[in-house]
Swiss-Prot record:
InterPro entries the UniProt entry points to: Ribosom_uL1_bac-type, Ribosomal_uL1, Ribosomal_uL1-like, Ribosomal_uL1/biogenesis, Ribosomal_uL1_3-a/b-sand, Ribosomal_uL1_CS
UniProt entry keywords in alphabetical sequence: Repressor, Ribonucleoprotein, Ribosomal protein, RNA-binding, rRNA-binding, Translation regulation, tRNA-binding
HAMAP family the record matches: Ribosomal_uL1_B
UniProt family annotation: Belongs to the universal ribosomal protein uL1 family.
Protein's recorded name: Large ribosomal subunit protein uL1
Ribosomal protein is among the record's keywords: yes
Lineage: Bacteria, Pseudomonadati, Thermomicrobiota, Thermomicrobia, Thermomicrobiales
Position of the signal peptide: none
A Gene Ontology cellular-component term: large ribosomal subunit
Assembly with partners or alone: Part of the 50S ribosomal subunit.
Molecular function as annotated in GO: rRNA binding; structural constituent of ribosome; tRNA binding
Summary of the function given for this chain in its UniProt record: Binds directly to 23S rRNA. The L1 stalk is quite mobile in the ribosome, and is involved in E site tRNA release.
SUPFAM superfamilies (alphabetical): Ribosomal protein L1
């Protein structure tokens, strides 16, 4: 069991682990337990009632957070020719093809999202063993494989404006950044609602019974705040609709 420092243990005293907090209570409390001397990330952790061993129960999608995550993601685009020019003008941080592929194969991963033109996927495909487990592999399901170069600016803008990808891990959990300690309570709350609703809408048909088993929000260095699942899901639905 990991050993925690004095500040963490002091922060933990503020959390009643036997309670399940409402979203409003949780976002207020999570900022109080964020004790580090930097602008900590605030992350949403969800345990899903799925069996990740079955492909038809895996959860994956994207969500555009209304207030972003607190940082501008670095976007890489696999493209050549006119598509590369459009991507550069649209603000992509890295644009290329064979050169970028070689760098990634060599261990370079200094980017947060990757987009590929469809005609590049034959070359990009083998990178799946590197990018897939990090959630960076371009995928048609998440809109990051683009056929028309003229669609690139919209995709790049959306990612830089707060679109994030979510997917379950091998244990059926989803982890998603919903902001930073410096966000207002309302900004965190709205990002939380939009994220939860998007994940709820991504529920696979093969999943039976209750979809969400538990939800927690936590700062980078502090303890988690357990959420009341039913209340959070209902408030998220009402906010989005």
């Amino acid at each position: 069991m990991p050993k925690h420092g004095k500040k963490y243990l002091e922060a933990l005293k503020l959390v009643d682990v036997t309670r399940r907090y409402s979203p409003k209570e949780a976002v207020e409390l999570v900022k109080k337990v964020a004790h580090a001397d930097f602008d900590e990330s605030i992350d949403l952790h969800i345990k899903l009632n799925i069996d990740p061993r079955h492909a038809d129960q895996n959860v994956r999608g994207t969500v555009t957070l209304p207030h972003g995550t607190g940082r501008t993601p670095r976007v890489l685009v696999f493209a050549v020719g006119e598509a590369a020019r459009i991507a550069e003008e649209a603000g992509a941080d890295y644009v290329g093809s064979d050169d970028l592929i070689r760098q990634i194969e060599g261990g370079w991963l200094e980017f947060d999202a990757a987009i590929a033109m469809a005609d590049q996927m034959g070359k990009v495909g083998p990178l799946g063993r590197i990018l897939g487990r990090r959630g960076l592999m371009p995928n048609p399901r998440t809109g990051t494989v683009v056929r028309n170069p003229e669609d690139l600016p919209a995709v790049i803008r959306e990612i830089k404006g707060g679109r994030v990808e979510f997917r379950n891990d091998r244990t059926g959990n989803i982890h998603l950044q919903i902001g930073r300690k410096s966000f207002t309570d309302q900004q965190l709350l709205e990002n939380l609602y939009v994220a939860v609703d998007a994940i709820a809408r991504a529920r696979p048909q093969a999943v039976k019974g209750q979809f969400f088993q538990s939800m927690t929000i936590a700062p980078t260095m502090g303890p988690g705040i357990p959420l009341d699942v039913a209340t959070t899901v209902e408030e998220a639905r009402q906010f989005v609709t």
